[in-house]
Each structure stands twice: as C-alpha cells, then as structure tokens.
Amino acid sequence: MDGGGGETYGCGGGRREGGWAWAAAAADSVFSRSSSSAREDDEEDLRWAALEKLPTYDRARTALLALPPDGELREVNVRRLAADEQRALLERVAGVADDHAGFLCMFKERLDRVGIKLPTIEVRYENLNVEAESYVGSRGFPTIFNTYANIFEGLGNALHITRKKKQKISILHNVSGIVKPHRMTLLLGPPGSGKTSLLMALAGTLPSTVKVSGTITYNGHTMDEFVPQRSAAYVSQHDLHMAELTVRETVSFSAKCQGVGHHYDMLMELLRREKEENIKPDPEIDLYLKQKAEVVTNHILKILGLDICADTIVGNNMVRGISGGQKKRLTTAEMLVTPGRALFMDEILTGLDSSTTFQIVNSIRQTVHILGGTTIIALLQPAPETYELFDEIIILSDGQVVYNGPRDHVLEFFQSIGFKCPERKGVADFLQEVTSRKDQKQYWTHGDSTYRYISAAEIAEAFQSFHVGQAVRTELVVPFGKGKSHPAALRTSKYGVSMKELLQANIDREILLMKRNSFLYIFQAIRLTVMAINTMTVFMRTNMHRDSIENGRIYMGAQFYGMLMIMFNGLAEMGLAIAKLPVFFKQRDLFFYPAWTYSLPSWILKTPISFLNTIVWVFLTYYVIGFDPNIERFFRQFLALFVMSEATSGLFRFIASLTRDPVVASTMGSSCILISMLSSGFILSREEIKKWWIWGYWISPLMYALNTLAVNEFLGNSWNKTISGFSEPLGRLVLESRGFFPEAKWYWIGVGALLGYVILLNVLYTICLIFLTCTVDVNNDEATSNHMIGNSSSGIKGMVLPFVPLSITFEDIKYSIDMPEALKTQATESRLELLKDISGSFRPGVLTALMGVSGAGKTTLLDVLAGRKTSGYIEGNITISGYPKKQETFARVSGYCEQNDIHSPNVTIYESLMFSAWLRLPTKIDSATRKMIIEEVMELVELYPLKDALVGLPGVSGLSIEQRKRLTIAVELVANPSIIFLDEPTSGLDARAAAIVMRAIRNTVDTGRTVVCTIHQPSIDIFESFDELFLMKRGGEEIYVGPLGQHSCELIRYFEAIEGVSKIKHGYNPSTWMLEVTSPMQEQKTGVNFTQVYKNSELYRRNKNLIKELSTPHESSSDLSFPTQYSQPFLTQCLACLWKQRLSYWRNPRYIAVKYFFTIIVALLFGTMFWGIGQKRNNKQALFSAMGSMYSTCLTMGVQNSASVQPIVSIERTVFYRERASHMYSPLPYALGQVAIELPYIFLQTIIYGMLVYAMIGYEWSGAKFFWYLFFMYFTLSYYTFYGMMAVGLTPNYNMSTVVSTGFYTMWNLFSGFLIPLTRIPIWWRWYYWICPVAWTLNGLVTSQFGDVSDKFDDGERVSDFVKNYFGFHHELLWVPAMVVVSFAVLFAFLFGLSLRLFNFQKR
C-alpha cells in the first residue's frame, strides 16, 4: 500500500527506491549470517534441535547466544541473563538501528513463514465535537477577588441560586475522518487549531472537564468496549519526567510497566508453529522477542539517537541534564515501547535538527509500513523531505478539518479553490499558511476574480465536495465490521504486566530516587542527630529532678518536643511527594500501573529511614535526659515514636496527594500540625479543652502518641514515689494533672491507635492518587486560539533607537567540565571537553545561523559567549569590537533568548515586556516612547491580541509553547540590544509563526545589529534568510564557518568539492543535505574528517584573518563603558521590582487567598479552644494555657508563613537568575521588592488574626496591650516569612530549603521558653535562648499582657511577680523584645538579599 507515501519498504528486497545516507549500512547488519565452518553449523543445528524438544513454556524463556570473542554458543535463560550474557546480547542487537527496516523485515518474515498475522487498527471519528468552559476577560484572571467570587459562585450554582458565568469555548467542531493502518498521517495546523485535543480524543486521554460528543471507534468498537490507553499511545508535547532518573532508567521503567515486545500468546503460538514446521529462527531475532525491557529499551534509544546520553540524568531548570531536544525525544521513547498499535504523537520533534527529525520519522514510518501500525504525528515545521515520508495529511484550522486524505491530492484540492504553492515553497509551510487570514492572499491564483478571505469553515465545506472528501464520507457510511478485527488488536486488560511486576518496577524506581536524593536523607539524619544532642544537653538529667509536678511537666515537655522533632522530620516528605505527582498522574492516566503499586513503595521504602531516625533520637536522648532506666521502657519509647513517625509521614503524604500544590499543602500541613498540637493534651489539658472541641482530642494522633509516651515514663519505678500532701505516686499525679489516663493499658491503646492511623492515612493517600486528577491545565494551548489576528506591522520602528553597532570575535574557545562519574572508569582525562578550539566572529548587519546535530554544542557555545555559564572551565579569547569582553558591560548591550522560556507566571505579556523595557532601556527613553516600542514589538511577533493574557507556568497554565517562545524573543527585542543571541527561536513554532519570528529577526539585523541564532529545522525560506553559517559537529568542533551565498551556493560549492560527499538533489533543502552529508555516520563511511578539511581550507585562513582584523580596535574607537552598572538607578530598580511583585501577588490566590483563609480558620480555632482564658488570672495553669496559645500561634502561623512563601520564592528565583544575567537590576532591589510586597499582606493577616483572637480569648481591652499584641504578631509573622525566603536563597532547591527550615523551626521551638523556661535551661545553652526569635516573641507577648498585672494567684503570688521570677520577663524592659523582633525581621530580609547576591545555584 503506497498511496503517495514516498518510498515503500518491502521485506523481500529491503528498500525499493532511493536511500538516505544515514541508513546505508545494511551490508554490515548484525543480522547477516557469516559463513562459519561446517562444524560450527552442525553444533548450532544440534543445539537448536535440543531447544525445540523443550516444552513451549520453557522454549519461550530459552535461547542461544554467541559469546565473544570466539562466538561460543551458550544456552541462556532470557529472564535471568548473567552480566556477560547481557553485554553480549546488547552488542549483538545494538546495530539494529543501522538497518531498522532490515530488522523489522526479518521479524515480519518470521511471522509470515508460519502464517501469523499482526493485528492492525483502523480509527474512525464521526461528528466529533470538543467543548470546554472557561471564564473570559478579566474574570479569567486568577486574582484574589476572582478566587473568592468563584467559590461563592460555585456554591450558588450547586444550590441553583445563581447561573453559571463560564462561557463555552468550541475546540473541535463536527470533525470526521479515518486513520488507517500501514499509513503515516501528518497532522498540520496552527497553534490553537485543536490538534492536541483531536489527538487526545482519539487516544482516549481527554480530561473529564472537557465535553466530548460524537463517535470514535477502533476497528468498529466504541471506546467503552476496550481500554484505549492500552490499545493506543498518546505522546504529549509536554515533557514530564523524573529529573533524578537517567534517560535509560526512564525508558526502561516505561518498558517494564507497559510490557514490551509482542503479546505473550502470540509468542507462544509462534514457537508452537515453528516447532511443528521445523523452522530454525534467526538467533538475534529469537533473543530480541523473548527478552524483556533491557534490549527493547536499548533498541529504542538507538533509533532515537538517545544512546549517547542514555546514562545522563534528565534534569530540570535548576539541575543540568539532557538538552531540550533530547528531552523531547525521551518523551517519545517512553511511549514507543508501548505494545499499543496506534500512535498519536503531539509535536514530538520540537527542538531537533532536520536530519535527526528525518531519521526518527523514517524509523517510525518503517515500523508503520512493515508491521501495520496506525500513526498520526503532529509537526510544526516539517522539512520537505520529512513531509514526503507521510502518506496522509490532516489539516486543522479553527477546530475544523479542512483536509483529510492522501498527500498526493492535497495541492490539487487547494488549487481547486484558488490557491497554489510557489515553486520554492515547502508544501507543509504552504499548508500551514494558506488558512491564515494574514498569509492567504499571497497564494491566490484566480486572477480573474477578486480575492476575498476564505475562512476555515468555507474550506472545510469545499473539501466535502472534493473527490477525496466524498470518498471519506462514503467510506464512513459503511461501518467497519467488528468481525474483521484481529483478536489481539484491542486491549481489554488495564495493565501490561502482572501486579507483581508493576509493584517491583515501582519499588526499583523508588529505590533509585531515594539514592539520587540520598543527600537529602543524610542531611535529615545529621540534622536530627544535632537536634538530639541539643535536646539531651538542654534537658540533661543532672538538671532534671523528680520531686514535683512542675518537674514532671518539664519531663513531659521533653517528650512533647521529641514528638514534634519526629513529626517535623517527616515534613520534607510532603515536598518530595508533590514534586513527583505530575509524572505519576501522567503515567496513571496512561495505565502504566495502578495507584497502589506507586503508593505502597513510597510508604514501605521510607520505613527503614523512619526506623533509623527514631533509633538515633531515642538512643541519644533517652538515658542522657534521664527517662526511666528500665530497658523495656527504652524500647517501648522507641516503638511509640517509630509508629508515630510512620503515622505523621502518612499524614504528610496524604496532604500532598489531596492538595497537589506546594503552597496549599504547606498551609494544610500547618493546620494539621496546629490542631494536633492543641489537642494533644500538653498545651491544653483534657479538662481545659472546651466540650465543643473534645472530639479533636480523641482523633488527634499526637494525643495518643503523647499519652503513650507519658504512661510509659510516669508509671515507671522512677516516679513511683509520693510527695508531701499527696498519697498517690508522683507519676500518677503528673499524668492526672494533664488529663492523661494513668493506666498501663493506655500504652498499647495508643500504639494500636497510631498503627490504625498509619494504615488509614496511607489508604487515604492511595485513594487520593486513585480518584484525584492533576492540577495541570492540559488544554491551555487549545483554549487560546490566536492564529487569526489581523494585520501586523511589517517593520520595527521602535527598534530604530540609538545604539552602537558591535562585533564579537572568539578564538580558540575551549569549554570543559569535570568528568561525569559514569565516564570516569572509561576515561583517562579528569575533564570532559565539550568545545574544542572554536574560533569565529559575528558582525553587525550579518545574520548568522549556528547549526549542528543535537549534541554538537550549539547552546554551550552561546552560553559561553553570552557569559551564562555558571560552572565548568572556559579558555580562549573573546573580544567586543576589538576590546576584551567584560561581562558587566557586555550584559548591558546584549540580549539572550534562552531555549527554556522562563518568565514570571503571574504577569501578563504586556507587563512582562514593560518590565524588561523599563529596566533595560536607557533613562533618557520616556514612558511614551517605551510604550510605543513595546506595542510595535508585540505587533511584530503577533502577540498584541494576547497582550493581557497571563504568562502562566510551562505545561501547567497560561500561554502555549509557541506563544511563550515569542514572548521570550519580545522580552529581548524591547531592550534594544546591539548583540542578540537566540537559542532555537523557532522551536515549538509552526511554519507560519517561525516565518513571522524570522522576519522580525531579519528586520532587527537590517538595523545594523549583530544577531546569532541556533536553529534546528529551517525551511528553505528560513535557512536562506541567513547571511552566514557557523556549522558544528558532535564533539564541539566547527566544520564550516562562512557565507551561505545566493540559494546557499557558497555552502553547496564548499561541501560538494570534498571527495566522497554526494551532490545535492534539485529542490532539496540545503540545511538538511548539509547535516546529512556531515553526520558522524557519513564521516565514518567516507573517512573524511570535516574538521580537518575546514582547518586546512582557504576559508579557515580567511576567517582567521578576519578574526585578527576585528580583534584590533579602530583608532577612533573606545572600550565599551557606562557611567553606571545598570541602565536604571537604584530607586527605579526598586520601584520596577515592587511593581511586578505587586501584580504577581495579587494574581496568586493559591498563596494569598489560601493564607487568609488559613488565618481565619486558625483564629477561630484558637478563639474557640482558648475561649475566655485571658480573663482567668487566679491560677498559674490558666497563665500557662494563655502562654500556650501564644506559643502555638508563633509556631503554627509562623511556620505556615515561612513554608508557604518558599515555593513562591523558588519559582521566581529561576526567573531572577535569567533577569540578573541580563543585568536588569542588582539583587538588592529584587530582594527589597520581594520583601516589601509581603508587608501589607502580613499587616492585613495580623489585623484579621488579632481582632478575632484578642476578643475571643478575652485579653484585657487596653489600647496599649492591644497595640503590643498586634506589634509582636506582625513582626513575628514578618521574620518567619523572611526566614523562609532566606532559606530558599541559601539552598539549591525547594526541597532542601524545607529540610533546612524545619531544623531551625524545631530549635526555636525548643528554646522558646515554653517547653523549658529560661531559668531551667542549662547555663551552656542560654546563649541560644537569647538569639532565638520565638523566645523574644513570647517574652513580648507575655510581658505586654501579664507583666504589669497586679492580680494574685490562689497561693497569694502576684501575676507580675510570677512572670518576672519564673520566666525572667520584666515589663519595664518591654522595649527590648520589641527592638529584637524588629531586628530579626530586618536581619532575615538582609540575609535573603545577600544570599541572592552571593549564590547562584543554577548549573549551566
């Protein structure tokens, strides 16, 4: 079946026509049988005969393998290969990618010989409609006001009081078509046309929030008759992977979960028939079919060119890993191992060079044609040679199918309605642009009639009358007979392998992740050890006595603190769990595994860590503090704390899975800690808890834990003595004073309750994973259709601002990094060199393309030249117009569009550009001119209609990939730089958007600027818009640096003159040809070292002379200098940063709105639990309870503020690194803006909390006392918030900041003066009391409320005297704690700014 698909693969004679250079190694196929001796053949025949006598079950697990070096045949169990056997097998099969078609043909022939047919799938969709509901306009902004309005509106809708204000958005409108097996289908359409929604609908992966109508069938079966996620594979355009795993581990995990190779029943049938017909299979094919994940994984990695980075971690924005193009291929590889027969692939090749793109698509095409797969691939800029690989074309525009049929007829159809593709125009580019309102007119050929815009609806209607459309409609009328469907085509089981194998795969992965995060766990253990040492020296037995109930309270305080330490130690589990959830939800929805196989390892494998941490704590503290010396009670305390640790870890995992957001999770986690603490029986005794809160006491895990620990300690022999005035043992008195149960059975009741919580919370964690969905907005790119946006300006008037044209030269540039651990055993050098003696020059008015295959070092070179590298070793000379480059001044005159589009998520496009222009344009540019520049740049990159759209987070919300890319370019263009580096500016854009961007870049160059672009898949038009080419090969070496010439004539002449290089075909894309003929495989085949050829050429000598000339400054020139380090003065920087932070905070309800909601809940909780306790001044217990409310407030409200701000600062810090590298501002204004914006929100939080709590607790209504209460609360919340910021600034990532912060929370808790007063703290630790901010807060709050009270307790002691004698608080010195808490807030804010200035944790 050809149907216009270009070449056709036949299994009898290999490829029938033509041949691309990359796949010309068929003669050396690893599957060709060598002419061995007769003796060896006889031996092999005998071994095969022995294998055939085995039962079929055993035969499926046994194969023959030739071991190097002498080819010794060995009978192996494919399920349990030894290390040398695995190595030999991988070497034998490693060459399959060199002749992928040959390998597939051999496999197909093996099936054909015994009459086994492979299953195929025909997908039909009829009258398919997809709709979504969304708020539009300003109501769609996630502001605090809108958030609360949405909540009330949702309640109103549920009660049928109000009507819905969401508007329906049509994504796909009444589309129909057929996708057939053995056919490669290309899906084209501009962003926002509905491509992603169509692919997800066909794959059965659309979210439930989207309304779908119409019919989709596979082989005549509707989707409720089988499992579409197992029968098909959807490859997302969003790259979601575990950053800590390597490429090989990621693909291998997918293979283990989905079941690789071919269905087990088919393999058994194949072996049975071969045995009956006495057929001896090819040994490598036999091994490949029987092997599990390892061989298939390596095969896929080889095909996709990922074998070179197979053992490199994936990485993320903060951790260096694989490149963007490699990450995109990894997303494809993860799904290619699926046994599904239908593939729906969404923009899978963004960021890849045209040669690599061609190779990958061709490999997929070979698989589809030979094995009968069904495939739709959405591509943005397919090169002509890649376009020719497809058999069928689907074109979407405005949610309508305007063409669905053979590639051969698509141009005929558009000619029939008056549009013709120009001769040197890529057909795919033409098809992308012909439906566009802006570009359609240039293709109009009906000169006898006046042109008018023909809409997508009109084109779709015309297609129905075209003969292809009529044929599709006719075929749809006849249903596909279900009886024709192969029994194995559609999967009816949810999962690919047994539950045992899925559980084992998740266990193996969890162990790997724990190893990669081992530093975190080691740091936790070290921190716990330090805290244990601190605790045992604070509560040292020499200072601990057993002669009063008050002393018993100190012992109980040590137990309570130990519980909190163990509890807080599990807090980091929340952040780790949330970080993994996006990948989990993706894999769960694709039926990689059931949720319980994921949740069980994450619980069970953390248990040994809890066990060891508890041992450390109990072993260090138990005897030194002086708990009961009975060894049995020692182990009982260990058991109680261990079970409590498991329960609280389960609680934090449950919160993570329930909220799925770090900010909301930290708030909810703080609420749970607060409720557990207040109802534990320590802060408030059981008798003091109000009757309406007693239920909280009975369900609190901390109550059972503390009751268990207290019973274990105070019923011991050490406390079995009486004191004067009492007949009961002291231990029972201590227990009864706090309302605990003084019976020994309560130890086991408590342990049993905690075990119940362990099970319950982990079950709830699993239930959340089963039923809840990811918070990612999957369809954000479809809901913002933006491709019909009227006319835009043709030039950049605003870019014609005064600037100094600058050239940049670089000579003998070397860049190396420390040798990765994985390569140290194989390498003799201590460093890995990524750039090798690179030399060149970029000049004003010259547009240079920086090209090369993936891994050539293009981005690395740009990073080095732009000064963006933060690690590694750089050698060589870089000059700017003849003067040595100085990064401080260079950053002022250069712009760098990074490959990763990093922007603040909560500002609009216009605001992002305003911020960049405000800080980077000179001070003499007034606001009107600045606004004009911004608007013209937005018009230029066609973002003007979206100027009020929020940027959002990549893959989560806001702008689509291509809109984000255009914003990245616009942010740099508004800065009016002299030198611009653009790293893959057209990746992720469709052909039309790429052309728009290149026109903008060309206009920029024509103003006399120096512009360098890395580019991967340029069309002929785009490639020939460049003036010069800087071509690199893998390994970081240049192979051509020079002009392109008219129609690339200079480039073609240079390479065609090299012996062994094939001539370019007529009409072939020069960029694709150039990459093909210089590929590593061609270098190996022809024996040509293109680097040496270049360095021996006249062109190289000419370039060296040019570098020498440009490296010498002109006599009239001067070195680049500016009167100030930054474009704008310090005050303007502060105002700009504060302006952006104000917008970001107002539109961040998950932080601000949740914070206020939490504040109100906590205030009501405290007020109702401590109701009226401030008025009770007749006994000391009431004072302790009032102080307990203050202590709990500081701990919970403060920790919540600190924990919730950390993910916000962490996200913005990534943006800060980019903006600081561009010298937009210094770190101090940024830090001031981040700090200052918090102050009004904290003030409002303080007022809300203070008004509610002060009145409900019943403190004395005095103006001074109320002021001091608000004063200390405000600065306490402030220093906690700023401490959270500081912790992020001092640590490399959010998870580590959480661990570090938790250590200080617990230290502050210990030395706050509540668990153990100052007068009882050992002398050697009192210094820490004086530097503990919480101690000063409690000092201020207690002193201001009770330090001047003259009322007397029952025993006759004045309240003010007790406060002075017991706590050491002096009312006349109230100004001291006031000054100290203010100083702590200022100190932490200052250290936050200092950390931003001194540390850069971004590894590049």
Swiss-Prot record:
Domain of life: Eukaryota
Record flagged with keyword Amino-acid biosynthesis: no
Segments forming domain ABC transporter: 156-423, 808-1059
Residue positions binding ATP 1: G189, P190, P191, G192, S193, G194, K195, T196
Entry-linked PROSITE patterns: ABC_TRANSPORTER_2
Keyword Nucleotide-binding: yes
Binding site for ATP 2: G852, V853, S854, G855, A856, G857, K858, T859
Gene3D superfamilies per the UniProt record, alphabetical: P-loop containing nucleotide triphosphate hydrolases
SUPFAM superfamilies assigned to the protein according to its UniProt record, in alphabetical order: P-loop containing nucleoside triphosphate hydrolases (SSF52540)
GO cellular component term, pick one: membrane
Keyword line: ATP-binding, Membrane, Nucleotide-binding, Repeat, Transmembrane, Transmembrane helix, Transport
Subcellular location: Membrane
Example of a GO MF term: ATP hydrolysis activity
Pfam families named in the record: ABC2_membrane, ABC_tran, ABC_trans_N, PDR_assoc
UniProt domain ABC transmembrane type-2: residue ranges: 501-714, 1132-1346
Membrane topology: Multi-pass membrane protein
Positions of transmembrane segments: 519-539, 565-585, 607-627, 638-658, 663-683, 692-712, 751-771, 1152-1172, 1183-1199, 1239-1259, 1266-1286, 1298-1318, 1321-1341, 1373-1393
Function statement: May be a general defense protein.
Entry's family note: Belongs to the ABC transporter superfamily. ABCG family. PDR (TC 3.A.1.205) subfamily.
Protein name (database record): ABC transporter G family member 47
Annotated source species: Oryza sativa subsp. japonica (Rice)
Primary gene name: ABCG47
